[in-house]
Each structure stands twice: as C-alpha cells, then as structure tokens.
A protein has these predicted regions:
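HAD-like aspartate-dependent phosphatase fold
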Residues: 1-135
Length: 135
C-alpha cells in the first residue's frame, strides 16, 4: 500500500506515531498539533477540507476529542480514495492495575459512523507482515 507522494496522513495518535511517519518521509497533519487539542465544539463552518489528505491513520491517542474524530470523519467522507488505516484493532490497552480503551476502541467510532472497516497496518495484521517480507 503506497501513499502518493503529494498526499499526507491525518493522524489520530501521539508523538511516537508522528516519529514513525517522519522517519519514512510521510507528511502528516493532526496528531499532536495544538489546534486539534481542544475541548471547543467542532463546527463544520470552521472546517477547511485539505484535499491533500490521502489517508487517516488512527492509533492510540490519550488526548482524543470530538474535533479529531470529526476531522478524520470529514477527510474520509470528502476526499475520494482516502484510506482508513488503524495501527491495530485492540479493544483494550493493558496498564499497571488494569485495562484502558485501546486504539481499536478509538477507530470503532469512525467504523460505526462510516460503516467501513479500517485496514489494520500493525500487529498482528497481514499488512504489517507484508511490509516485513518486502524489506
């Protein structure tokens, strides 16, 4: 799966995911960007679609909010061919003392709204194994 060089990724995730994308030379928006770290209501009238977003990548994001989900939803809905990717589909995330919602719980919101499953590119999905074999 190749993203065209003129396209970028909208990230729901944290700094580690941004580092991985940058190390592969992949442009991205969202993620830890300050404008997406807000508790203000999301408004479609303020949203400016970026037609260069060719994929939405949903990972674990401990700062998830309605703005991030709404932007991801709009890119996937408006940008023809925009890929819906998930780092993994884990429903929970083990922490000391118990469990927290995992990355799959975050992408589930978009799955439900879009009626579309993401391509899981992390463990233990076939996409990751294909990438390992190709290297």
């Amino acid at each position: 799966m190749k993203l065209p060089p003129n396209k970028k990724v909208y990230v729901i995730g944290m700094a580690g995911l941004e580092t991985e994308l940058a190390s592969e030379g992949i442009s991205y928006v969202g993620g830890t960007a300050p404008e997406d770290h807000t508790l203000e209501p999301f408004s479609l009238s303020d949203f400016r679609n970026d037609p260069d977003v060719g994929a939405v990548l949903c990972g674990l994001d401990m700062h998830i909010n309605y703005t991030k989900l709404s932007k991801a939803f709009q890119y996937l809905r408006l940008n023809e061919g925009c890929l819906f990717l998930a780092t993994n589909t884990d429903s929970t995330y083990p922490v000391n003392g118990g469990l927290l919602p995992g990355a799959g719980s975050l992408s589930a919101t978009l799955r439900y709204a879009l009626k579309k499953d993401p391509v899981s590119i992390g463990k233990p999905g076939p996409t990751m194994l294909d990438c390992i074999k190709a290297k």
